[in-house]
Amino acid sequence: MLFWIIKITSYFYSSTLFEVMNSVLFRGVGGLFFSLFISIVIGNRIIVWLKYKLRMLQTIRIDGPQSHKLKYGTPTMGGIIILISVVTSVIIWSDLSNIYIWYILFIFVMYGILGLVDDFLKIKRGDNLGLTILNKYLWQSIIAWILIVIMFINRVNYVENQSGLEFLRNIVCKLKIWDMILAYFVIVGTSNSVNLSDGLDGLVIVPVILVVSGLAIVTWVVGNIYITSDLYIEHVDCIKELVVVCASIIGAGLGFLWFNSYPSQIFMGDVGSLSLGGVIGLVSILLHQEYLLLIMGGIFVIESLSVIFQVSYFKIFKKRIFKMAPIHHHFELKGYMEPKIVVRFWIVSSILVLLSIVIFILSKY
């Protein structure tokens, strides 16, 4: 919105200032501070609203670590803070004529709604189950496939004089079914991985901020034709606008961390983790950096693998590899204090993000 106001104004009042204000870098910084401001301003109000008016309090697992009983009475659904802050910031600071922005908003909002339903059912039923695994996976898949089909059809160049059969054949050839399947697994897989990682105060939001920061750097590089030509990196047209989205998520994440740091005043809930994970996966697809995400989001991968190995091993051998999965609970049961586990996960995530950026640059030589 602000992009077009500045653009229209610059037609009547030509100025270098307007050019700077309309740059992606300026709007990215603006989006970051704006979403940070919004999240801090609305944070306390939403916490009070969820805790005292709606009574949306986190249910505690009976078989979980004993220390988690102290968390009873803490409100959940804190991802609403992030959702409102990011969507508002993106609408104000980004170029809404860019199709990538709408892809991001679609997956962010739809996965947010799905997470909201899941959180609500957990609280209503008084357990920690919510939607069944099958139902959650089904709706994640439906949302992902709707977006993927739209994305890949938009990549097809329509030729008016083609016959219906020729046009259909052209679409089928250019859709690249394997790319679509990969995109599906990246979106749904990342969404669930971030969701599994959300189990301790501040544990997931900082790795999300770090990974999104890494993706913002990659976005800036692949979106700049001069940098890509110098580094022999694949250039992606119009992708640089996603810097504004990434910056808005970073700002909202920092604002949420203000309330989610130990001891947490509010939990993110599925409304936040599913939507953030979906966006991270989608951005990596749009950047053509799906494999780089495996390193950059290594913390999420480790958390997911710990659950997969635990469940598989138990079904086969009737024994457990870890005391509890995901793996952050294993460390809790081994006697590590929650803040120490969280900070160490942050350190590992920082290293992985830096390593992935180095690999991204050096792999082109």
Curated annotation (Swiss-Prot):
Gene name of this polypeptide: mraY
Function text: Catalyzes the initial step of the lipid cycle reactions in the biosynthesis of the cell wall peptidoglycan: transfers peptidoglycan precursor phospho-MurNAc-pentapeptide from UDP-MurNAc-pentapeptide onto the lipid carrier undecaprenyl phosphate, yielding undecaprenyl-pyrophosphoryl-MurNAc-pentapeptide, known as lipid I.
Cofactors: Mg(2+)
EC class: transferase
HAMAP family, per database record: MraY (MF_00038)
Pathway(s) served: Cell wall biogenesis; peptidoglycan biosynthesis
Listed NCBIfam families: mraY (TIGR00445)
GO molecular function, one term: UDP-N-acetylmuramoyl-L-alanyl-D-glutamyl-meso-2,6-diaminopimelyl-D-alanyl-D-alanine:undecaprenyl-phosphate transferase activity
Name this protein carries in UniProt: Phospho-N-acetylmuramoyl-pentapeptide-transferase
Enzyme Commission code: 2.7.8.13
Species lineage: Bacteria, Pseudomonadati, Pseudomonadota, Gammaproteobacteria, Enterobacterales
